[in-house]
Amino acid sequence: YDFGRDQTKDKKPGSVFVKSVRKGEINWAVITVILRVKDQDSYGSGKTINIPSPYGDSFTYMGWSLITSTGSNQYKLRVKTGEHYDANGFGKIGDRYVIACTPTFGKIGDEIDFVLANGRVIHGVMGDEKNMSDAGCNKWGHDGGHSVVEFVVNKSMWYHTGKTVTRFHPEW
């Protein structure tokens, strides 16, 4: 991706630029969400959701092994994909980070791209759905909407360690 512009591109033949509309904040960066339907060929060909300020200003994480309801789509996705992690313990499906977010952004298995104001793109796949009935959850996420993106991680590598998402990805 060309992160030096106000637009992002996947460099695939016939692909169009997707202009980032700058709404909402994530720490120091403004965030736009570009949704892709699974197995689409062109980047950003799904719908765009603009996250309003002050939502989305923190990242959280959860252990992938905590998804234990065998009949759920979350569990089926975890088993089907083999529960793979990168060297830092982030859950990965292919080249995408496994994330949890509210149904505002899609359903289990959907590919979701979060475009930050600096042009960086967090390429995610929805591996868990945040519970809208949880105290403090709204349509954007937990903690009153401040936690829009929750990364799914290797619980044994992350819990009780003081690790943070931005420790491994300060560019976010």
Range-by-range predicted roles:
Residues 1-38:
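Extracytoplasmic soluble-region selector
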Residues 39-172:
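Solvent-exposed, well-ordered loop and adjacent helix/strand elements within mature globular domains
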